[in-house]
Amino acid sequence: MAPLGYLLVLCSLKQALGSYPIWWSLAVGPQYSSLSTQPILCASIPGLVPKQLRFCRNYVEIMPSVAEGVKAGIQECQHQFRGRRWNCTTVSNSLAIFGPVLDKATRESAFVHAIASAGVAFAVTRSCAEGSAAICGCSSRLQGSPGEGWKWGGCSEDIEFGGMVSREFADARENRPDARSAMNRHNNEAGRQAIASHMHLKCKCHGLSGSCEVKTCWWSQPDFRTIGDFLKDKYDSASEMVVEKHRESRGWVETLRPRYTYFKVPTERDLVYYEASPNFCEPNPETGSFGTRDRTCNVSSHGIDGCDLLCCGRGHNARTERRREKCHCVFHWCCYVSCQECTRVYDVHTCK
């Protein structure tokens, strides 16, 4: 979470929240902590456009999964960027949970939209397969004929339904004829396509003594970490676009085209952006940068998590920490584990 002093500065900013996906705050606000005990109150979710409000009321039983999906997306973002200058910091007590970072059409904005959209599709799909909602369940659209020695069985996860929920809800506010809406729609879809392209068969053996005389198989989503890794690669290779304006019957419309014609045209699985990112080295409330001072760095790494790059050339401090940890653990039959407690010394390096 961001430091309090920085929050006070943020509060003084006049943020343009009209296009900000502030409904994401459902995943970190007080409603999230009470999901297991209280129903979702659609009217109390901040930032919903009328289409989202109608969707929430019609599908209220899957809204906890929507919140869980956004939460999973935020956590995966923080994992993927844990060693980078921008580490997906969230801002407490703010409807704009990422601060002004998402105001710009940068790579970071592209990734956050993609991983949040993917999170919603993933969580809804998994919840349906687990039988948590009466309006959805297992997929009845089994692709292909069974192979030799196996048959369809189990519960194939219905990514088409999960993707529909993500598309109808997450894309509902992205209907403006401007470049930013076009970018957000594209990256939201890239997140959903990341899951669809990683669906795979899972099988279970049946037979005496595990002989696997026959297998039953079903379609399953990958681990969400796989989706995070995939989208992080797409972040690193994101396509830079330029904005073009042209007149249509409804007025001026902004569209995106690749800045460099000698690169391949981005597919629906690629991320796109059209504004440069700040360097995130120093605190800057206008860009949402918290800087990298006091961040832990890896002194032995030459990558972005290394002290040279993460600390932006300012140097780093070194100290030792003594930590008490469990060690020499032994399993006893039956059934408990006993451990000793050891003191270990660690070298810690932090940015100046």
From Swiss-Prot:
Residues making up the signal peptide according to the UniProt record: 1-18
Disulfide bond residue pairs: 77-88, 128-136, 138-155, 203-217, 205-212, 281-312, 297-307, 311-351, 327-342, 329-339, 334-335
GO biological process, one term: positive regulation of cell population proliferation
Superkingdom, natural source: Eukaryota
UniProt-reported outcome of changing residue 211 to A: Does not affect palmitoleoylation
Effect of residue 277 to A: Does not affect palmitoleoylation
Site (Cleavage): 26-27
Glycosylated position list: 87, 298
Role according to the record: Ligand for members of the frizzled family of seven transmembrane receptors. Functions in the canonical Wnt signaling pathway that results in activation of transcription factors of the TCF/LEF family. Required for normal embryonic mesoderm development and formation of caudal somites. Required for normal morphogenesis of the developing neural tube. Mediates self-renewal of the stem cells at the bottom on intestinal crypts (in vitro).
Effect of residue 77 to A: Forms oxidized oligomers regardless of TIKI2. Does not affect palmitoleoylation
Gene Ontology CC annotations of this record: cell surface; endoplasmic reticulum lumen; extracellular region; extracellular space; glutamatergic synapse; synapse; Wnt signalosome; Wnt-Frizzled-LRP5/6 complex
InterPro entries linked to this entry: Wnt (IPR005817), Wnt3 (IPR009141), Wnt_C (IPR043158), Wnt_CS (IPR018161)
Self-association and partners: Forms a soluble 1:1 complex with AFM; this prevents oligomerization and is required for prolonged biological activity. The complex with AFM may represent the physiological form in body fluids. Homooligomer; disulfide-linked, leading to inactivation. Interacts with APCDD1 and WLS. Component of the Wnt-Fzd-LRP5-LRP6 signaling complex that contains a WNT protein, a FZD protein and LRP5 or LRP6. Interacts directly in the complex with LRP6. Interacts with PORCN. Interacts with glypican GPC3. Interacts with PKD1 (via extracellular domain). Interacts with FZD5.
Covalent lipid sites (O-palmitoleoyl serine): 209
Result, substituting residue 216 to A: Does not affect palmitoleoylation
Modification after translation (UniProt): Proteolytic processing by TIKI1 and TIKI2 promotes oxidation and formation of large disulfide-bond oligomers, leading to inactivation of WNT3A.
Protein name from the UniProt record: Protein Wnt-3a
Tissues and organs where the protein is expressed, per its UniProt entry: Dorsal portion of the neural tube (developing roof plate), and mesenchyme tissue surrounding the umbilical veins.
Record-stated family: Belongs to the Wnt family.
Location of this chain's protein in the cell: Secreted, Extracellular space, Extracellular matrix; Secreted
Gene giving rise to this polypeptide: Wnt3a
Other facts: Gene targeting that leads to the production of a truncated mRNA causes full embryonic lethality at 10.5 to 12.5 dpc.
Keywords: Developmental protein, Disulfide bond, Extracellular matrix, Glycoprotein, Lipoprotein, Secreted, Signal, Wnt signaling pathway
